[in-house]
Regions:
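Chalcogenol-based redox active-site neighborhoods
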Residues: 1-178
Length: 178
């Protein structure tokens, strides 16, 4: 499937969310859809696999900015194509992830309800999502997208800077902090 880009609308999807801070299965899961987080910006951060080396460094770094995203009416959602129980076990058993307080999501569906497939970032040769970041406005329109090689991590500070720039509605030169 062709990758969606700036200006494209995110349509119907359903993923299983692991609630912020959850470490046990009791009440840990909630379905997240295109209708969730009404009126909010969504920062959707795909990573390839749980229990890997680069992925937790990104999740922890993004999570350190979770309150900054919230201050901007944005919800941080990090996820992969591993299932929700894998995510919960990883969070509960990883010293750094154990301290995170943001949403994780499991995008295990294939076909029309898969968010990774809809956005065009499911990479079949690896059986995983590419390392992609989408900033989606409250109307579910994609306003920013970046995709990295599976082996290369991202800069959460740059994602926050781009969100700030998008929310101003003004021109924003290179490296300008908002």
């Amino acid at each position: 499937m062709k990758m969606k880009t700036v200006g494209d609308k995110v349509t119907e999807f359903a993923v299983t969310g692991v609630k912020p801070g959850a470490l046990t299965p009791d009440g840990a899961f909630e379905t997240i859809t295109d209708q969730s987080f009404e009126g909010k910006w969504k920062v959707v951060v795909f990573y390839p696999k749980d229990f890997t080396f680069v992925c937790p460094t990104e999740i922890v770094a993004y999570d350190k900015l979770v309150n900054d995203f919230a201050d901007r009416d944005a919800v941080l959602l990090t996820g992969s194509t591993d299932n929700e129980f894998c995510k919960l076990a990883w969070r509960a058993n990883h010293e750094d992830l154990k301290k995170t307080n943001s949403w994780m999501f499991a995008d295990v569906a294939r076909g029309s309800l898969s968010l990774a497939e809809q956005l065009g970032v499911f990479y079949a040769p690896a059986g995983a999502a590419l390392r992609a970041t989408f900033i989606i406005d409250p109307d579910n329109i994609i306003q920013h997208v970046t995709v990295n090689n599976l082996d290369v991590g991202r800069s959460p500070d740059e994602t926050l800077r781009v969100l700030d720039a998008l929310q101003t509605g003004e021109l924003c030169p290179c490296n300008r902090s908002i």
